[in-house]
């Protein structure tokens, strides 16, 4: 029986590579039993130096609601990160006084 993480990808993008741990994380879109899935999955390098999917990851049916919710979440996270960077850059001294003293 083929597992969902073994189905051939329709789209694949490397989104993280940890060379020291021989790990990669890929964003993929694949079809399994006639359903398209969006997956974020960790891959490991086997003894033959081939990249293999691990069981660590998540797969969601690729539909409008899941895509929109994922996009909304990423936009919110990126906005918070951007705001955090701006606050740290412009108010670092004040924040250090508040939180480190």
What are these regions (language model features)?
Residues 1-20:
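Negatively charged, low-complexity tracts enriched in Asp/Glu with abundant Ser/Thr
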Residues 7-8, 52, 60:
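Intrinsic-disorder/low-complexity coil detector
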Residues 16-30:
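Enzymes that process phosphate groups on RNA ends and nucleotide/triphosphate substrates
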Residues 19, 47, 62:
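Solvent-exposed, flexible loop/coil residues
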Residues 21, 33-35, 66-68:
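A generic structural micro-environment signature
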Residues 26-56:
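A short, structured beta-strand/loop element
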Residues 56-101:
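Mixed-charge, Lys/Arg-enriched low-complexity segments
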